Regions:
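Active-site-adjacent betaalpha module
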Residues: 1-7, 44-52, 63, 69, ...
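Short glycine-rich His-centered loop
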Residues: 9, 18-19
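Positively charged, low-complexity intrinsically disordered leader regions
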Residues: 14-15
């Protein structure tokens, strides 16, 4: 039987959301990304996870031409077509260039907030016998919350790297982390020890 594995999922760290030249670069979210030094710290965490033999995966939100997968009634996504956001194949849906991707990393494209909804993520994790998920990204109140709750209910051990996640304000981030603490372990990137189960 294949040994149990862990993965570090990097959530929605794509140019449309975290690049200084992207549409959110001058928004409150962009300010939080810079203030919390998310890019440099996430790059360090990816390196640390790889050195520990932990798998790495990248999650992005994206829609094909014409946005057929985009939910028209969603307050989160319904404005994407009019604003040209999250177009697959475009610069905006590329993972930020400061975050090293390698061949063999798990790549997940999602059309909703949760990376588990209507994607191949769970099949990829089960095939690799992943039982523990480390995660971080933007935003805390959206993809991080959804990943933790959905992962918890699928019986994964969930760990959030708190300092590598952010929301549109400190208060939103803190409120989200407070509600997540029941469903996961909360760690800091400089003290976390990445381990396989």
């Amino acid at each position: 039987m294949q040994a149990a594995r862990a993965i570090y999922l990097v959530l929605d760290m794509q140019n449309d959301l975290v690049h200084a030249e992207g549409p959110n670069g001058k928004s409150p979210l962009g300010e939080q990304v810079r203030k919390r030094e998310l890019l440099v710290k996430t790059a360090r965490a990816i390196k640390k996870a790889r050195e520990a033999g932990v798998l790495v995966g990248f999650v992005r939100v994206g829609f094909t031409a014409g946005y057929p997968e985009c939910p028209p009634n969603s307050p989160v996504f319904s404005a994407a077509p009019a604003n040209g956001l999250f177009k697959l194949g475009a610069w905006g849906t590329e993972i930020h260039p400061d975050l090293e991707q390698r061949e063999g990393d798990i790549q997940v494209t999602k059309h909703r907030v949760s990376p588990f909804y209507a994607t191949g993520l769970e099949a990829a994790l089960r095939a690799r016998n992943v039982t523990k998920i480390y995660c971080s990204g933007v935003s805390t109140q959206a993809v991080v919350q959804a990943t933790v709750r959905d992962g918890h209910d699928r019986d994964y051990e969930m760990i959030v790297l708190e300092d590598l996640s952010c929301a549109h304000s400190d208060q939103e981030h803190e409120n989200s982390m407070g509600s997540l603490a029941r469903f996961c372990k909360v760690e800091k990137s400089d003290t976390v020890t990445f381990t396989n189960p």
